Regions:
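Active-site-proximal beta-alpha core segment in soluble small-molecule metabolic enzymes
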Residues: 2, 8, 13-17, 21-24, ...
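Active-site anion/phosphate-binding pocket segments in diverse small-molecule metabolic enzymes
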Residues: 2-23, 31, 73, 92-94, ...
Length: 392
């Protein structure tokens, strides 16, 4: 997180994304995997809440492509001018195949039937289509089975005359559990599958067995890496470590300051009753903006460099905090939900623990009403609102 201050952008609620931290993280990852490996930035789920199109533009040539989960995300990037490789990691609906081929979107395949449909669409358009071959080595999710039937399917896919199979990949299931034998077992299964596939004449240039936890916990393997959570300076497990910088801060502002007398209740259901005379501030952010409602009466925010506990039930658009120990709080003051203000920091992981969830869930849940503000050199470089077309 950049600096030691809360930036006031003038918005109701906003997420600051530190581009200098983002590029630092990419540099650290690049140094770990070497210059020859291909980097694919995973920007599904709106780049884990950080803003997909905007991040793609800032990443530029630091990565060799982008990965999304579905066709809608892929076509959204294309329509906003993002060029280069975009790969859909999930399944493709049959009706979307011609459009994906037309827009040069790479597709993940795990059946010869789907591969044939992509192949037919490519031939009908007089072009070639790029595919990524998914292999299930233990995640029990998408992918070819690692048996004779799966091998036959893979060979059929690789023989399609209008397809370029750019990468074969598999996804670790337990890489965040260092003591688990599953990751090593998956690697061996994957290596055997590739070896037998190549013995049958198939050649696939890029090989990938990774996620953020695997890269940090098990090091290099293959020559293509998909960068997800760690790109944003967040770690997939507490036992993993890296010299990464969190890129995201989440802030809002005070809408009203009040004094409550002993016995007065706060918010829906009066789940908090003032034990004495207290001073409160209402903030312009709620669970519709991504703040977990499970933080009601738990956790807190930072305002003027001091900690302010959350009072009562978090509302859809607002929340209330105790500012009794903070002097001179006024309407319009900035409150930090995630990030640093002065000497205090609230991390994504702090919130995830209180909400009994994972850091992925917190950042992916940041809502559309929260303006994304992109910071370079400690200053606002650009901003994007999903609901206000004047902020783009």
């Amino acid at each position: 997180m950049f600096g030691g201050f809360a930036l006031d952008t003038g918005f109701r609620a906003w997420a600051e994304i530190d581009i200098d931290a983002l590029l630092h993280n990419i540099k650290i990852i690049r140094s770990a995997i070497g210059d020859e490996a291909e980097l694919i930035a995973v920007v599904k789920a709106n780049a884990y809440g950080h803003g997909d199109t905007q991040l793609c533009r800032y990443l530029g040539d630091t990565v060799q492509g982008y990965a999304v989960a579905c066709y809608d995300e892929a076509i959204g990037l294309r329509r906003t001018g993002i060029s280069g490789r975009i790969v859909i990691l999930g399944a493709i609906v049959e009706s979307c195949i011609p459009g994906a081929v037309k827009d040069n979107i790479s597709l993940t395949v795990f059946s010869a039937d789907t591969a044939k449909k992509i192949n037919d669409a490519a031939k009908a358009q007089g072009k070639r289509a790029e595919v990524f071959l998914a292999v299930d080595t233990g995640m029990s999710r998408l992918g070819l089975s690692c048996d004779e039937a799966g091998l036959c399917e893979a060979l059929k896919i690789c023989s399609c005359d209008a397809l370029d199979t750019h990468c074969i990949f598999s996804h670790p299931a337990c890489a965040d559990i260092v003591s688990s034998p599953v990751t090593g077992r998956q690697k061996k299964i994957f290596e055997t599958f590739i070896r037998v596939l190549e013995q049958h004449g198939a050649h696939i240039e890029r090989k990938c067995f990774d996620n953020s936890a695997a890269l940090l916990g098990y090091g290099r393997w293959g020559n293509l890496y998909k960068l997800g959570l760690i790109m944003h300076g967040l770690l997939p497990a507490e036992n993993l470590h890296a010299d990464l910088i969190p890129t995201l801060s989440l802030r809002t502002r005070v809408s009203q300051v009040k004094t409550l007398e002993a016995g007065e209740g706060v918010s829906y259901g009066h789940t908090f009753i003032a034990p004495r005379r207290i001073k409160t501030a209402t903030l312009c952010i709620g669970y519709a903006d991504g703040l977990p409602i499970s933080l009601s009466n738990r956790g807190g925010v930072i305002i003027k460099g001091k900690y302010a506990p959350i009072l009562g039930r978090i509302c859809m658009d607002q929340m209330i905090i105790d500012i009794s120990e903070i002097d001179d709080v006024q309407t319009g003051d900035v409150a930090t939900i995630i990030g640093r203000d002065g000497e205090l920091v609230v991390t994504v992981d702090d919130i995830a623990k209180l909400a009994d969830t994972i850091n992925y869930n917190i950042v992916c849940g940041i809502g559309m009403r929260v303006t994304r503000v992109y910071i370079k050199d400690g200053k606002q470089d650009s901003a994007y609102s999903y609901v206000n077309p004047d902020i783009r």
